Amino acid sequence: MAFIHLDIRCLYTLLICTAFGSTLSSNAEIKVNPPQDFEIVDPGYLGYLYLQWQPPLSLDNFKECTVEYELKYRNIDSASWKTIITKNLHYKDGFDLNKGVEAKIHTILLGQCTNGSEVQSSWSEATYWISPQGNQETKIQDMDCVYYNWQYLLCSWKPGMGVHSDTNYNLFYWYEGLDHALQCDDYIKANRKNIGCTFPYLESSDYKDFYICVNGSSESQFIRPSYFIFQLQNIVKPLPPDYLSLTVKNSEEINLKWSIPKGPIPAKCFIYEIEFTEDDTTWVTTTVENEIYITRTSSGSHQLCFLVRSKVNIYCSDDGIWSEWSDEQCWKGDTWKETLIFSLTPFAFVSLLVLLIACLLSYKQKNLLKTIFHTEKEGFSNQEIHG
C-alpha cells in the first residue's frame, strides 16, 4: 500500500509540473508583430505632424486580447522622449522643424490570450527631416513676436548674415482651426524688404500652438527657412494702467490705486508691478489687485511718487511681457504752505514796491511843502521890512 500511495503522489506532482510547464511554454510561444507601415507625415502645417501606422500581421490570433500601442517620439538631439499609449492607429503633435524628428512604436498585448501577462513586440522606427537648403547664416535673425493687448500680433526679424541684396523673406503661419497655412498679407517693410508682419484678427487662436515659418528667396543663393512655435497667450503685452491716484490716509497709511488696462484681457488675468518712491528711497512690489495700501517709512517725508505696469499672470498664461510704465503720480507734503508762500510772495513784493513809492512820494511832498513854506516865509519877512 505504501508503494501505491507513493505512486499516486508522484503522479500528482508530475501532472502539476506538466501543467505549469505547458503554461510557461505557451507564454513563451506567444509573439506579436510590431505595427505595419509606421510613418511620419507632414501635412504642410509648419511643424504639426501626423504619426500613423497599421495593425500588426496575424492579429486575428489574439481576438481575446486587448491590443495597445506604445509610441515614443522626440526631436532629434532632445534629451527625453514623449510617451503615449493608445489604441488608435494615429497620433498628432507639434515639432520643431529646424531639427529632425524620430519616433518608434511597438505593439502591446494584454488579456486572456496571454494568460494575464503583457507581451510586447519589437520596435518599429521612423524619422522625418526637412531637406536643408542654404547656409545656416542665411536664416533670419532676432525673430520677435508680441501679442499686443491680446488683440494684435506683430512679428519682426532681421535679415540673415551675408545674404545678397536681392534676398527677401516671407512669413507663413498656421494654427489648429485653419484649413491650410496662410501667408502674411500685411508686411512691415524697410528699403522695400520684408522685415516683419502685422497679423489680422486671429479667431480662436488662444491656448493653441501657433506655427510660423519664415523662408526666403534669392536668385543668387538658397535661403534656409526658420520655424517657430508660440502660444499666443504667453507673448501678450498689455496696455499700461492709467488714472493713477495716491491718497495719504493719515500720517502713516498710503492708498495707491489705478484703473484696469483697457481691452479684452479679464481683470483676473493681471499682475501689477509698482515702483514706489518716498523722497530718495525707491522700492518695487507686485500685486494682483488694482489697489494697494502701503506704510510710509517716515511721517515727515515730503514727496511720494509711484508708477505701475501690468502683465498677464500665471492663472491665464505661462509667461508674458510687461507693459510700458504708466505716467508717474506724486503727492507732496505741506502743499498748502508752499501754495501760500508762492501766492504771498508776489503780493508782498508788490506791497513793498507800493510802500516804497508811497514813502518816496511822501518824502518828496514834504520837501515840496518845506520849500513852499520857506518861500512864503521869506516873502512875508520882506514885506514887514519894507513896511
State what each model feature region is.
Residues 2-11, 17, 76, 90-120, ...:
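Beta-strand-rich modules
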Residues 355-387:
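Cytosolic C-terminal tails of single-pass type I membrane
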Residues 1-37, 65, 70-76, 101-104:
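N-terminal Sec-dependent signal peptide, specifically the hydrophobic helical h-region
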Residues 80-89, 184-193, 283-291, 322:
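Short beta-strand segments within Ig-like beta-sandwich modules, predominantly Fibronectin type-III
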Residues 47-63, 151-163, 246-247, 252-267:
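Conserved aromatic anchor
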Residues 228-229, 233, 246, 251-253, ...:
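Extracellular juxtamembrane "stalk/ectodomain stem" immediately N-terminal to a transmembrane helix
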Residues 338-361:
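Single-pass type I membrane protein transmembrane segment
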Residues 22-30, 109-136, 218-238, 313-341:
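Extracellular fibronectin type III
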